[in-house]
Regions:
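Bacterial N-terminal signal peptides
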Residues: 9-17
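Inhibitory N-terminal propeptides of secreted protease zymogens
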Residues: 21-95, 120-123, 261-263
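Protease zymogen maturation seam
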Residues: 73-131, 139-147, 160-161, 165-202, ...
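Flexible, small-residue-rich helix->loop connector segments that border functional cores
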Residues: 135-145, 178, 185-193, 203-231, ...
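Active-site glycine-centered loops adjacent to acidic/histidine catalytic or metal-binding residues
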Residues: 136, 296, 357
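Catalytic-core environment of secreted peptidases
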Residues: 163-164, 168, 186-201, 210, ...
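Catalytic-core segments of hydrolase enzymes
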Residues: 219, 249, 253, 258-348, ...
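Hydrolase catalytic cores
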Residues: 222-223, 233-239, 254, 262-263, ...
Length: 416
């Protein structure tokens, strides 16, 4: 850079930037192919924190956010502050024990799986040779229900590959069991397999109240139940406090594509219409990766991202009567619904849990996508929508606000 150009750039920086805050600001930037991030960082007085491989997308700590003219002069194509993303909350009714003689995937016979005819689809496809990335919190690799269902993933929190280490049982999450009455309608199913609800004295070591530690295991358990021959790639982006950010999630989406995922489940959301998320989703779609996301648990039609982004299979929650779950989001951006009330799934430490939330509806759709993707490489979303059951009549207050309806796995995989 000549002395004259440097002077002009410095003048622009002084003229168009806001006053420097006390603390640096995390800024995501995508630069043009001809720009150099080292030079960009130097001109902004910034520190380079991280880079997304093969994307020209970088995370900087900047003293000030450059104005649009300044950014343009440096070759920055777009930029946004790296905002935080919090793990969605969910209702947890109970933690269950199941006798060791019971098969690890006993919960695939639960009422919600019967409603969507998941078992009826397995003679036609089991998800063989399909990798499903699950962008989530930590997963219990040693859980009986997940053994043989997990492939190598990556832990973006600790920045190292994720492998076969089981969770420390002394740190697994536990919520109050006072509402076990909600399980009454499922007692018959539980009794078939000898499942029992832990009381507080039995579960005394399960003291962590943060759901982030169990969320990844619960979602993986749902995927494994629906597509048992698929391989789940756990990508941890949420720490044990349930915190992540836009940059880390965008990095994980691209990692999934570059490491062979054909389906990606995203059971989280943010109100931020993020350019980085949109860029990552478009990258995945261009690679023919099926992207599934939970619609959110705020009982609103306000869009949640990435679910509301074009091409993402946004999934709401319904109950066993095909009524919209009281907590579930709805709206014009929805693709389908799936059961999300009182779902049985794997829980860290070899236990099982009963949970509610759109977080557990999305993995049902992701598992269904894996079954279809095992049979054919195109038309996955069309197969899911065409096979879905219209539930407008059961939800008169949400007509055309619940997408194509509630999924029917058997019909999506092998139409009558």
């Amino acid at each position: 850079m000549t002395r004259r150009n440097f002077s002009l750039t410095l003048i622009l920086l002084l003229a168009f930037s806001v006053s420097a805050p006390a603390n640096p600001l995390p800024l995501i930037v995508q630069i043009s192919p001809t720009a150099n991030i080292t030079n960009v960082a130097a001109m902004l007085g910034a520190t380079l924190v991280d880079t997304i491989p093969r994307a020209n997308i970088h995370l900087l700590n900047v003293p000030v956010v450059p104005s649009s003219p300044m950014a343009y002069s440096l070759g920055i194509e777009w930029m946004e502050l790296n905002t935080g993303v919090t793990m969605p909350g969910f209702v947890q009714v109970g933690i269950l024990t199941v006798p060791g003689t019971t098969v690890s995937d006993w919960y695939k016979y639960q009422p919600s799986m019967q409603l969507i005819r998941a078992g009826a689809a397995l003679p036609y496809s089991t998800g063989q040779a399909v990798v499903v990335a699950d962008i989530n919190s930590q997963v219990d690799y040693g859980h009986p229900a997940l053994r043989g269902h997990l492939t190598s993933g990556y832990d973006f929190v600790t920045a190292r590959p994720a492998g076969s280490t089981a969770l420390n049982q002394a740190e697994t999450g536990f919520l109050d069991q006072a509402e076990t009455g909600f399980l009454d309608s499922e007692r018959g199913f539980m009794n078939q397999f000898g499942a029992g609800v832990l009381d507080r004295s039995q579960a005394g070591f399960l003291y962590s109240l943060n759901p982030a530690y169990s969320h990844g295991t619960l979602c993986a358990g749902v995927i494994a139940a629906i597509a048992p021959a698929s391989m789940i790639m756990p990508l941890r982006v949420f720490d044990d406090a349930g915190r992540s950010d836009i940059f880390t999630i965008a990095k994980a989406i691209r990692y999934a594509v570059q490491h062979g995922a054909q389906v990606t489940n995203m059971s989280f959301g943010t109100l931020t219409a993020s350019p980085a998320l949109r860029n990552a989703i478009n990258y995945a779609r261009n690679a023919d990766v099926v992207m599934v996301a939970s619609a959110g648990n705020n009982n609103t039609s306000n869009p949640q991202y990435p679910a509301a982004l074009s091409g993402v299979l946004a999934t709401a929650a319904t109950d066993l009567l095909d009524w919209k779950a009281s907590f579930s989001n709805y709206g014009s951006s929805l693709f389908v619904t799936a059961p999300g009330v009182k779902i049985f799934s794997a829980y860290p430490g070899g236990y099982y849990s009963v949970v509610s939330g759109t977080s557990f509806s999305a993995p049902m759709v992701a598992g269904t996508a894996a079954l279809i993707r095992s049979l054919r490489t195109t038309g996955v979303s069309t197969s899911i929508s065409a096979g879905s059951v219209n539930i407008n009549s059961r939800n008169p207050g949400y007509v055309n606000q619940l997408g194509y309806g509630r999924i029917d796995v058997r019909q999506a995989v092998h139409p009558n």
